[in-house]
Amino acid sequence: MVPGPHGGGARALGSRSILASPLYRDMKDKLNREVKHREDWRPFCPSLPIEDYRTYFEHGTESDFMILAYPVRAECRDAIPGVVHVDGTARPQTVRADANPKFHALLKAFGRLSGHPVLINTSFNVQGEPIVCTPADAYRCFRNTDLDALVLGDYLLLKDDQLQRAAQREDYQKQFELD
């Protein structure tokens, strides 16, 4: 997901983000190994609509910047295991509709489909590289990692489609062999 202006700092707050379902326990490992290329112990943060915060967290308050860790409600830990740290906490980002309407709407839509309006949200980069800045950066990272899809503004690119098109392009270009 690469909508809007580039944010500052080390956190991806809905722009230049890699988003994934937190519903699978192994999603954290998959993202760390196959996408981010970093240590397996490193956790991911949940983004959720501010109005759903108390459903998942007993303590704390709104957290726009993924700075503080709070205990995840015991009854929710198995529902969103991809964002729960080993100590039962998570470092949430609360999203307000007035501050980030598209990201808020995406979280709500995911909630309607999955029952949980929560997504793993991590910076759109791999270990040792800065967060993507341009569409070309985003496309390069997408092509060279195990990401399934890339959203650039109003465009959706699917990895399988991109691979198929690359193969078709190679076949097409073979007809123009040099003499």
Regions found by a protein language model. Give the residues of each.
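Flexible beta->alpha loop and helix N-cap segments adjacent to enzyme active/binding sites
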Residues: 1-179
